[in-house]
């Protein structure tokens, strides 16, 4: 018999897709590959870190079956945590600004999570403060803390990186990904460089908010990257180069992925593929790899995207 033991067994082992039509569109002399992360159970790469963080916390006895998982989040990590918590029989309480989309709230409540809406004007800092206050007053509560928890990057070191290396038989020349929590770029790059030191690793941030490369914070439209600060999880030791991508190009390439490759992905996927194309224009006969972190369905209400 061949079957999976619930949610956690479904996470990872996503396909690596060659973007051949985009290669032809731009007359590239390199091969572009992308890790198709929408194939994770809730449709994003964040399922990997949600699984790693909660399973490790259970193993270390930092949490138990009566623990309340508390996380301030507005995006994919929250959805992943709610799903993993449900599969493990844990209660989740998610704090998010009231400005966040109704779709995301409904996804989390579908997994049995409790949603606490905070003042939209206070943004994520307000949600973080409210979550910490709640946790301080709630016995046996646990904040996963995706920006600070090293199990975040460990998930990618243990799974995503090895999957990429295996699927290309070790023939990886360039890897690039956006800076969100820093877990994806840190974990994957660390693994790849341990196998092959001369792999070029590139981190991507919004042109309008180049915090890592220039120390400048600003508003941008690339959801999922550009947190506005340097996360503790991000280890630049494993990043050779930092580049910026304009929000408009991220939008354009998210549309291009759908219309040329039939891959319906989110905004950060567009940013990653735009930069992969730009790098490919400067090289020949190289394997360039990036990630497509989530699906486009979560961004249907974003004006001007699709």
Predicted regions and their residues:
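PLP-dependent amino-acid enzyme catalytic core
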Residues: 1-306
């Amino acid at each position: 018999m061949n079957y999976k033991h619930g949610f956690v067994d479904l996470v990872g082992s996503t396909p690596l897709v060659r973007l051949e039509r985009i290669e032809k569109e731009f007359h590239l002399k390199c091969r572009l590959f992308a890790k198709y992360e929408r194939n994770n159970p809730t449709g994003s790469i964040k399922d990997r870190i949600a699984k790693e963080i909660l399973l490790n916390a259970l193993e270390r006895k930092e949490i138990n079956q009566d623990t309340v998982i508390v996380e301030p989040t507005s995006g994919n990590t929250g959805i992943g945590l709610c799903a993993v918590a449900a599969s493990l029989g844990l209660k989740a309480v998610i704090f998010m600004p009231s400005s966040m989309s109704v779709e995301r709230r409904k996804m989390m409540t579908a997994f049995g999570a409790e949603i606490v809406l905070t003042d939209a004007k206070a943004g994520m800092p307000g949600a973080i403060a409210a979550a910490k206050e709640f946790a301080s007053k709630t016995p046996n509560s646990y904040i996963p803390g995706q920006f600070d928890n090293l199990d975040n990057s460990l998930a990618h070191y243990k799974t995503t990186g090895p999957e990429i290396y295996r699927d290309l038989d070790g023939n990886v020349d360039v890897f690039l990904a956006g800076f969100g929590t820093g877990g994806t770029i840190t974990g994957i790059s660390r693994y790849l460089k341990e196998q092959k030191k001369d792999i070029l690793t590139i981190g991507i941030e919004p042109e309008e908010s180049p915090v890592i490369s220039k120390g400048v914070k600003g508003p941008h439209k690339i959801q999922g990257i550009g947190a506005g600060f340097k996360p503790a999880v991000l280890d630049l030791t494993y990043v050779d180069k930092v580049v910026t991508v304009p929000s408009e190009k991220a939008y354009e390439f998210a549309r291009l992925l759908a219309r040329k490759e039939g891959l319906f992905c989110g905004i950060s996927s567009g940013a990653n593929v735009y930069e992969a194309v730009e790098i490919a224009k400067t090289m020949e006969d190289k394997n360039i790899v990036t990630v497509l972190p989530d699906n486009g369905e979560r961004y249907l209400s974003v004006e001007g995207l699709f």
